[in-house]
Amino acid sequence: MNPNYLDFEQPIAELEAKIEELRLVGNDSGISLSDEIGKLEDKNRKLTESIFRDLSAWQVSQLSRHPQRPYMLDYVESLFSDFDELHGDRNFADDAAIVGGVARLDDKPVMLIGHQKGRDVKEKVRRNFGMPRPEGYRKACRLMEMAERFKMPVLTFIDTPGAYPGIDAEERGQSEAIAYNLAVMSRLRTPIVATVVGEGGSGGALAIGVCDELQMLQYSTYSVISPEGCASILWKSAEKASEAAQAMGITAERLKELGFVDTLIKEPLGGAHRNPQKMAGHIKDALGASLERLESMEMDDLLSRRYERLMSYGAPQ
């Protein structure tokens, strides 16, 4: 099994391996195999379209965690210029699971805040697998208040399995830090756009997710608990994760239907990791459109709209 492909993508992996094999044969022998390769590439595209046309909620959940999926700093590099990272909560420490700083979107100054998971083992440990501690959320809050003072819009990138549940985090006030962020963001006098780029796990995601407009990538998820966690509670077995994912309605498409999500950002065929530059372009277009809408509003109207949005969560449809 190719580790770069999920279990339901293995037919695609096998076909792409054949295409690569033909390319190598053609290069070594000097024989043109372009017609055969072209036919296989067309077959591969149709196969990929067929598989991705009707993904289950559990398969979308797997895609949202794909190890090659672009993370926040990948998008920062592709979308923004003059990024200057800011560190520390001015209280305890700097949490590398939350990255933040000032940057420019085209010529517009913005404040960026988001989760960062890490690629290799060393970085994953340093980033705590994208699970922030209280100091991470307090750093995020400090940067949001700075953005308000300097009249910069806040752009957040959500990608976390959840807030870190360790004893040390609880001792330093994890729940208080999350709750305080919710309160601050609800009244922050600057536009806020949140984009879920991977998995949006529970309060750990919501702590930087209170916003004027919420965007989700096509194969991202947003939920109160992971499918495995839900299955372990309800069925006493994580093997029921597929059923849990379907029941919870965690996908961007389902949340858009419920009115929770404002914009669903289409991903390249096969997911964001198959064409990160194209994905970045789609996100940039969506961010630009959101900021144009929000910055045309009076601030008091924007805050009233944000409050109404918060109060509508969980209301009967």
Curated annotation (Swiss-Prot):
In what residue span(s) does the CoA carboxyltransferase C-terminal domain sit?
A: 39-293
Q: Which Pfam families match?
A: ACCA (PF03255)
EC main class here is: transferase
Instruction: Give the residues annotated as coiled coil.
Output: none
Mind naming one GO cellular-component term on file for this protein? acetyl-CoA carboxylase complex
Where in or outside the cell it occurs: the entry states: Cytoplasm
Any one of the GO BP annotations: malonyl-CoA biosynthetic process
Q: Which pathway is this protein engaged in?
A: Lipid metabolism; malonyl-CoA biosynthesis; malonyl-CoA from acetyl-CoA: step 1/1
Q: Which UniProt keywords apply?
A: ATP-binding, Cytoplasm, Fatty acid biosynthesis, Fatty acid metabolism, Lipid biosynthesis, Lipid metabolism, Nucleotide-binding, Transferase
ATP-binding as UniProt keyword: yes
EC number(s) recorded for this UniProt protein: 2.1.3.15
Q: Which InterPro entries match?
A: Acetyl_CoA_COase_a_su, ClpP/crotonase-like_dom_sf, COA_CT_C
Query: Gene3D superfamilies given for it?
Result: 2-enoyl-CoA Hydratase, Chain A, domain 1 (3.90.226.10)
Q: Which PANTHER family match?
A: ACETYL-COENZYME A CARBOXYLASE CARBOXYL TRANSFERASE SUBUNIT ALPHA, ACETYL-COENZYME A CARBOXYLASE CARBOXYL TRANSFERASE SUBUNIT ALPHA, CHLOROPLASTIC
- Identification of the protein by name: Acetyl-coenzyme A carboxylase carboxyl transferase subunit alpha
